[in-house]
Design a protein with these regions (language model features):
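Radical SAM/AdoMet-radical enzyme domain recognition
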Residues: 48-64, 73-127
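Short glycine-centered, acidic/aromatic-flanked micro-motifs in structured strand/loop junctions
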Residues: 10, 67-68, 101
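Canonical Radical SAM [4Fe-4S] cluster-binding loop centered on the CxxxCxxC motif
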Residues: 2-42
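Glycine-/small-residue-rich active-site loops that bind phosphorylated ligands and cofactors
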Residues: 14, 39, 70-73, 105-106
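Alpha-helix capping and helix-loop boundary segments enriched in small/acidic/polar residues
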Residues: 34-38, 69, 98
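Secondary-structure boundary/capping micro-motif
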Residues: 36, 44-51
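A generic structural signal for short coil/turn motifs at secondary-structure boundaries
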Residues: 30-33, 71-75
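Short, histidine-centered active-site or binding-site loop motifs used for metal coordination
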Residues: 25-28, 65-67, 127
Length: 127
């Protein structure tokens, strides 16, 4: 049974903190538009479609999100992502989600989403 693992940076190095030691800090100074670093829904769907084309029943896929700060891609992005996974997961492979976040953007709505979709949530304490 095939297993796939993806590390996804939906907001690239974009972050809502400015930690002096972060290597993404220098990168962000070169960006003029935060939207330039966000993963498009079309790219997300292509990744998901290709992923499930490779897997058979009994397979496993892990989608781990990190950044920068992945929550800056927005809750709508994550809703789209999980809905698209359900759309393409016709063979009913096991899906696991994880996210590494600084937690600053997490609201009750985010927490409910993470719970509903069974995300493993890691909080980084930086700053």
């Amino acid at each position: 049974m095939k297993q796939l693992q993806f590390l996804i940076k939906p907001a690239a190095g974009h972050c809502n903190m400015r930690c002096h030691y972060c290597f993404y800090r220098d990168e962000q100074q070169n960006r003029t538009d935060a939207e330039d670093c966000m993963m498009s829904l079309a790219t997300a769907e292509t990744l998901i479609r290709r992923c499930f084309a490779e897997l058979d029943k009994g397979g496993f896929v892990s989608f781990a999100f990190q950044g920068g700060e992945p929550t800056l891609a927005g809750l709508d992005f994550f809703h789209f992502f999980t809905q698209t996974v359900r759309k393409y997961n016709q063979k009913r492979v096991t899906v696991q989600y994880a996210i590494q976040t600084n937690g600053l953007a997490i609201t009750e709505e985010w927490a409910e989403f993470f719970s509903k979709e069974h995300f493993l949530v890691g909080i980084s304490l930086d700053g």
